Structures are given as structure tokens and as C-alpha cells.
């Protein structure tokens, strides 16, 4: 049974400014070391990569229905890719706890970017 759906769209230029600024703390605050390494390795596509991952985190928070309240940190949600490149959302700490509290059993993530925007959709499922 579906217990939550969230979607978010983000302007890629918003993240390009932070990719271009080595002193920007925003990327460290929102993204894990692994996420930053993955996106920065994309060179010209780094901003789109960061924007899509931010949209994924926002989409999860919308699907969960909490926003960043209730003790969830940006680092409690991490977008990783499987061996075929499929993006997955890895939860930890408070995000995982609240997901389980809602009887969450499955989490589905889709990412895309085009025309200066990145979009993500998250579907939460229970047994």
C-alpha cells in the first residue's frame, strides 16, 4: 500500500553557484561526503547532480509528511547509485526511524534533469 508520495523540482543554476564557489558551505551541509564525491566527479554535470539529489531529499520529506522537523538532518538521507546506476535513497538515524514508524517497507526514487531543472519523485510503501 502506498503511504506517501513526494515530488520536487529545483533550478540547476541555484546549485551551479555553489559548485563554482569553493568556500560555499551549503554543499557540505546538505550532502554527504559520498554524494559530494559522486557529483563532483561529473565535472560539467555536477550542478545537475546536486540539484537532483536535493530534489530527492525534499521529495522524501514531503512523502514522509514531516519536512525537516522532528530531528531529521540532511545527512540522514543519502542518494546512492547501484551497480547499474539506478539511484536509491539510503536512510539513516532519524529519517529511517520515522520511515519505520510509518510502517514503511519500500522506498522508490526517480530522478531526472533537463532544461535547467532537476526533478525527483519518491513513493513510500508499506507491507
Swiss-Prot record:
Entry superkingdom: Bacteria
GO CC annotations, alphabetized: cytoplasm
Protein residues bound to Mg(2+): 8, 58
Reactions it catalyzes: apo-[ACP] + CoA = holo-[ACP] + adenosine 3',5'-bisphosphate + H(+)
Single GO MF annotation: magnesium ion binding
Cofactor(s) this protein requires: Mg(2+)
Enzyme class: transferase
Keywords on record: Cytoplasm, Fatty acid biosynthesis, Fatty acid metabolism, Lipid biosynthesis, Lipid metabolism, Magnesium, Metal-binding, Transferase
The UniProt record lists the keyword Magnesium: yes
GO biological process, one term: fatty acid biosynthetic process
Annotated EC: 2.7.8.7
Compartment list: Cytoplasm
Sequence similarity: Belongs to the P-Pant transferase superfamily. AcpS family.
Function noted in UniProt: Transfers the 4'-phosphopantetheine moiety from coenzyme A to a Ser of acyl-carrier-protein.
Protein name: Holo-[acyl-carrier-protein] synthase
Organism: Pelobacter propionicus (strain DSM 2379 / NBRC 103807 / OttBd1)
Amino acid at each position: 500500500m502506498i503511504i506517501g508520495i513526494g515530488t520536487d523540482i529545483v533550478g540547476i543554476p541555484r546549485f551551479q553557484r555553489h559548485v563554482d564557489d569553493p568556500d560555499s558551505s551549503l554543499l557540505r551541509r546538505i550532502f554527504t561526503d559520498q554524494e559530494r564525491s559522486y557529483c563532483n566527479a561529473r565535472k560539467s554535470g555536477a550542478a545537475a547532480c546536486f540539484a537532483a539529489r536535493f530534489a530527492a531529499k525534499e521529495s522524501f520529506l514531503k512523502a514522509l509528511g514531516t519536512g525537516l522537523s522532528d530531528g531529521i538532518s540532511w545527512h540522514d538521507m543519502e542518494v546512492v547509485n547501484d551497480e547499474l546506476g539506478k539511484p536509491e535513497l539510503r536512510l539513516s538515524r532519524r529519517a529511517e526511524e520515522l520511515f519505520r514508524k510509518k510502517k514503511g517497507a519500500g522506498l522508490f526514487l526517480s530522478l531526472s534533469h533537463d532544461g535547467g531543472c532537476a526533478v525527483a519523485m519518491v513513493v513510500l510503501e508499506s507491507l
